[in-house]
């Protein structure tokens, strides 16, 4: 037959420790836990093979292509310190393996098949290096941080949001009423909960109309530009686009999408529409913990965050560091920088395995949301800085005097923290003091401070 039939070890072809990575390669760092008795080189090579050109046996059609040009290569393996039988396997993929401008294809190749592999007990994709040559094939966020600030005319501080609760069960008119109260009180944005789509108790069109009325009314009263994230997520792409188009016709500034449950293909279509039609796009990461929570299997959220920046979104939820959902500070700040900055140096202490150059792809605003309230404001201002959206759902609507006073309390706390920071005070040390001082002249804030003074989500 002219080729040697049979099964041969992956590492003979796909483990190449002397390979020099190219500037155009897509690089991946996998955390590999091999089955007992499987050498790490073989496990790493198996991942490289099965996520690129390889299959389990030699096939005669291998002779019709240049494997050297197209194969993924495992070029380095290191043990994970402090973990038994875990290794980081670095794999380089030639650029030509991937369709341009398709996060869907990127993920299908790199994580599509290998995670059920028998030779591995567990596998986790920790990071991806996206080369500029591939970055340039994506539109990325519809607008980005600077354009968003210019559209909203809001500078020098984080933006404030609030998710309308109870998330399911309100009628459209009462929902709009809650939106109006929050925006009038001083928030920049209110938000549809991620699971509010178009249910029997509140159809999407009714909600869109009442929310638009609420935000225009609040805008007229406060003289500030307001937004409500209208969730366009739907059961079909066509229906999603229909909702986005209706939002644009209402003249609202921003829509929202659940990018993991909706899928990358739908998300990228929506992002293109948003750029073409001047809509901002807020992204919720519902379902991320299914993929990213296990430490040894799945995908780290920083990979999902990079994927979103390519697919497109102007805001994305990124954990809080301080609220009810988990996230370590340095690691969170690592992927927050990956979302916002143009160029991020490799830094293993923050979980960043590769230097990432986004060239001119716009940045994404990280959203801190989940169990946060006024006492967290100094820490949030300190940790996230100006380019972020701080979202207080219960922390606004749970105010004893109602939504508008809840919004006032948050806005006063934020302005006090920003002012204190600008005066050179150390928010990490003096934060509580800053909030207490502000509460002296804001009864709304004083009431909020009283309600949440003891709340901690420590487990």
From Swiss-Prot:
<dbReference type="InterPro" id="IPR020878">
    <property type="entry name" value="RuBisCo_large_chain_AS"/>
</dbReference>
<feature type="binding site">
    <location>
        <position position="193"/>
    </location>
    <ligand>
        <name>Mg(2+)</name>
    </ligand>
</feature>
<comment type="subunit">
    <text>Heterohexadecamer of 8 large chains and 8 small chains; disulfide-linked. The disulfide link is formed within the large subunit homodimers.</text>
</comment>
<keyword id="KW-0456">Lyase</keyword>
<feature type="binding site">
    <location>
        <position position="167"/>
    </location>
    <ligand>
        <name>substrate</name>
    </ligand>
</feature>
<feature type="binding site">
    <location>
        <position position="194"/>
    </location>
    <ligand>
        <name>Mg(2+)</name>
    </ligand>
</feature>
<dbReference type="InterPro" id="IPR000685">
    <property type="entry name" value="RuBisCO_lsu_C"/>
</dbReference>
<dbReference type="GO" id="GO:0000287">
    <property type="term" value="F:magnesium ion binding"/>
</dbReference>
<keyword id="KW-0113">Calvin cycle</keyword>
<feature type="binding site" description="in homodimeric partner">
    <location>
        <position position="113"/>
    </location>
    <ligand>
        <name>substrate</name>
    </ligand>
</feature>
<dbReference type="GO" id="GO:0009853">
    <property type="term" value="P:photorespiration"/>
</dbReference>
<protein>
    <recommendedName>
        <fullName>Ribulose bisphosphate carboxylase large chain</fullName>
        <ecNumber>4.1.1.39</ecNumber>
    </recommendedName>
</protein>
<feature type="active site" description="Proton acceptor">
    <location>
        <position position="284"/>
    </location>
</feature>
<keyword id="KW-0120">Carbon dioxide fixation</keyword>
<dbReference type="GO" id="GO:0016984">
    <property type="term" value="F:ribulose-bisphosphate carboxylase activity"/>
</dbReference>
<dbReference type="InterPro" id="IPR033966">
    <property type="entry name" value="RuBisCO"/>
</dbReference>
<keyword id="KW-0601">Photorespiration</keyword>
<dbReference type="GO" id="GO:0004497">
    <property type="term" value="F:monooxygenase activity"/>
</dbReference>
<dbReference type="InterPro" id="IPR017443">
    <property type="entry name" value="RuBisCO_lsu_fd_N"/>
</dbReference>
<feature type="modified residue" description="N6-carboxylysine">
    <location>
        <position position="191"/>
    </location>
</feature>
<keyword id="KW-0503">Monooxygenase</keyword>
<feature type="binding site">
    <location>
        <position position="163"/>
    </location>
    <ligand>
        <name>substrate</name>
    </ligand>
</feature>
<dbReference type="Pfam" id="PF02788">
    <property type="entry name" value="RuBisCO_large_N"/>
</dbReference>
<feature type="binding site">
    <location>
        <position position="317"/>
    </location>
    <ligand>
        <name>substrate</name>
    </ligand>
</feature>
<keyword id="KW-0479">Metal-binding</keyword>
<dbReference type="GO" id="GO:0009507">
    <property type="term" value="C:chloroplast"/>
</dbReference>
<feature type="binding site">
    <location>
        <position position="369"/>
    </location>
    <ligand>
        <name>substrate</name>
    </ligand>
</feature>
<feature type="binding site">
    <location>
        <position position="285"/>
    </location>
    <ligand>
        <name>substrate</name>
    </ligand>
</feature>
<dbReference type="GO" id="GO:0019253">
    <property type="term" value="P:reductive pentose-phosphate cycle"/>
</dbReference>
<keyword id="KW-1015">Disulfide bond</keyword>
<keyword id="KW-0602">Photosynthesis</keyword>
<comment type="function">
    <text>RuBisCO catalyzes two reactions: the carboxylation of D-ribulose 1,5-bisphosphate, the primary event in carbon dioxide fixation, as well as the oxidative fragmentation of the pentose substrate in the photorespiration process. Both reactions occur simultaneously and in competition at the same active site.</text>
</comment>
<keyword id="KW-0150">Chloroplast</keyword>
<feature type="binding site" description="via carbamate group">
    <location>
        <position position="191"/>
    </location>
    <ligand>
        <name>Mg(2+)</name>
    </ligand>
</feature>
<keyword id="KW-0460">Magnesium</keyword>
<keyword id="KW-0934">Plastid</keyword>
<comment type="similarity">
    <text>Belongs to the RuBisCO large chain family. Type I subfamily.</text>
</comment>
<feature type="modified residue" description="N6,N6,N6-trimethyllysine">
    <location>
        <position position="4"/>
    </location>
</feature>
<dbReference type="InterPro" id="IPR020888">
    <property type="entry name" value="RuBisCO_lsuI"/>
</dbReference>
<feature type="active site" description="Proton acceptor">
    <location>
        <position position="165"/>
    </location>
</feature>
<feature type="site" description="Transition state stabilizer">
    <location>
        <position position="324"/>
    </location>
</feature>
<dbReference type="Pfam" id="PF00016">
    <property type="entry name" value="RuBisCO_large"/>
</dbReference>
